[in-house]
Structure formats: structure tokens, C-alpha cells
From Swiss-Prot:
It is a multi-pass membrane protein. Its main location: membrane. SUPFAM superfamilies: F1F0 ATP synthase subunit A. It comes from Dinoroseobacter shibae (strain DSM 16493 / NCIMB 14021 / DFL 12). It comes from the Bacteria. Gene3D superfamilies: ATP synthase, F0 complex, subunit A (1.20.120.220). This is ATP synthase subunit a. It holds the Pfam family ATP-synt_A. Key component of the proton channel; it plays a direct role in the translocation of protons across the membrane. CDD domains: ATP-synt_Fo_a_6.
């Protein structure tokens, strides 16, 4: 909470992250439609609309929708190919879906009065756990027990290998935690700072500085939204590469 004496200014930067039901004021259950549900659905709808508009009636001179769709497709495809190799191309649809959902959800959260779904650890944790479970299953299906060689650093001195194995196992199971907190933390922090500057814009004495600050931070948040989608996706590719080629 922040208050300004004598101006009646009161603003709560963290209120924008409150999950509330779409209908009524009752308690939120796992089946309750909420603002999170709404904005995730809007993100999915926006992605579907973009891809349908971008792939229907493709022309030699592409439309804006086609250009954006092809740019996103080519960008993620090259990322998957460069990081995971040819073996990882078959998992491109899953990784592309992750990238587009996070990117569009981040951008929708920049609309005034909207809700940033990726600022909630509950959302990012599900995405990170899905990645963790998927790459682990792929690792065992493709390599069998050989997947466990990911934790055994054969190039290290023999005396250090057991210690390094413990460290590798711990770091492996910490992956979904860091994967989810990184995205949620960055999105929440940026939006909270933006809200603070927007609140101070109501104070005449500092309004010009606050407005300039809002504009600068908003531009930075656009960049952060894209970067965080990229970071989440490229880490997914790195984890997938470990599953496909676990040998150190």
C-alpha cells in the first residue's frame, strides 16, 4: 500500500494480482471461472486467430498476420533445431505452443485493466511441471536406464563423481521451481513497479516525472515480456536436449 498525505492518494500495487471470480463475490474453487480463466482463454483465442488468419490464403506478398505468424514459427523452429538438434524437431509443436501462450499472455497483461496470468506462480508452475514431466518421460522412453547417465559426470575425477551426482540430481529436481519462479517473479515485479509510478502520476508535484517513468517502464515491460517468453522456451529446449542426449 502507498498513501500520499493531503492528496487523498491511495493505491495498492499488488491488488492487480488478486484472483477474483467472474460471477459474484463468492469463494474461489478449482472449478470457479476467474479473471485468470478469462485472460488465459483470451490468450488462446488470440493465438488461434493469429495462426488462422496468418495461414489462410497465404500470399506471395504476406499480410501482417501472415508475416507475424511466419516470423514466430521460423524463430521458434530455428531455436529448437539449434539447441536440440534434428532429434528435437518432432517436439516443435509443443514448444511452439508454450512460446506463443507465454508471449501472448504477457502482452495481454500490458493492456490497461487487464490481468497478467503469467504473474501467478500457480500458472507458471503448471507450465514448468508440464515441461519437467514431459522431458523426464522422453528421457526414459528414448534412453531407458541410460537417462540416469545425465547425473553421472564421467569426465570428472572418480572421487568427485558421487558428490557431483548428488548436486546434479538436486539441480534437476529444482528445475521446475526456478523455471516457474523466474517467469512469475519478473512479470509480477515489473507490473508492480509500473503500478507504483502510475499511482504517483496523480500527484501534481511529481506527475511529469511519474508519467515519464510510466512510459519508460512500459517500454521496458514490452521487452521483458518477449524476453521472458524466450527464456522459458529456450530453457525448455535445453532440458529437452538433456533428455535426448543425456551423456556428459
Amino acid at each position: 500500500m502507498a498513501t500520499e498525505e493531503g492528496t487523498g492518494l491511495t493505491f495498492y500495487p499488488m491488488d492487480q494480482f488478486i484472483v477474483s471470480p467472474l460471477f459474484g463475490d463468492g469463494p474461489v474453487h478449482f472449478y470457479t471461472p476467474t479473471n485468470v480463466t478469462l485472460w488465459m482463454a483470451l490468450a488462446v483465442a488470440a493465438i488461434a486467430l493469429l495462426l488462422v488468419a496468418g495461414t489462410r490464403g497465404r500470399a506471395v506478398v504476406p499480410s501482417r498476420a501472415q508475416s507475424i505468424a511466419e516470423l514466430a514459427y521460423g524463430f521458434v523452429y530455428k531455436m529448437v533445431e539449434d539447441v536440440t538438434g534434428k532429434d528435437g524437431i518432432k517436439y516443435f509443436p509443443y514448444i511452439f505452443t508454450l512460446f506463443m501462450f507465454i508471449l501472448v499472455a504477457n502482452f495481454l497483461g500490458l493492456i490497461p485493466m487487464s490481468f497478467t496470468t503469467t504473474s501467478h506462480i500457480a500458472v507458471t508452475a503448471v507450465l514448468a511441471l508440464a515441461v519437467f514431466i514431459t522431458v523426464t518421460v522422453i528421457g526414459f522412453v528414448k534412453n531407458g536406464a541410460g537417462f540416469l547417465s545425465l547425473f553421472w559426470v564421467a569426465s570428472a575425477p572418480l572421487a568427485l563423481r558421487p558428490i557431483l551426482a548428488v548436486i546434479e540430481i538436486i539441480s534437476y529436481f529444482v528445475r521446475p521451481v526456478s523455471h516457474s519462479i523466474r517467469l512469475a517473479g519478473n512479470m509480477m515485479a515489473g507490473h508492480a513497479v509500473l503500478k507504483v509510478f502510475a499511482g504517483f502520476a496523480q500527484v501534481a508535484a511529481v506527475a511529469p516525472i511519474a508519467i515519464i517513468g510510466v512510459m519508460a517502464i512500459y517500454g521496458l515491460e514490452v521487452l521483458v515480456s518477449a524476453i521472458q517468453a524466450y527464456v522459458f522456451t529456450i530453457l525448455t529446449c535445453v532440458y529437452l536436449k538433456d533428455a535426448l542426449h543425456p551423456h556428459h
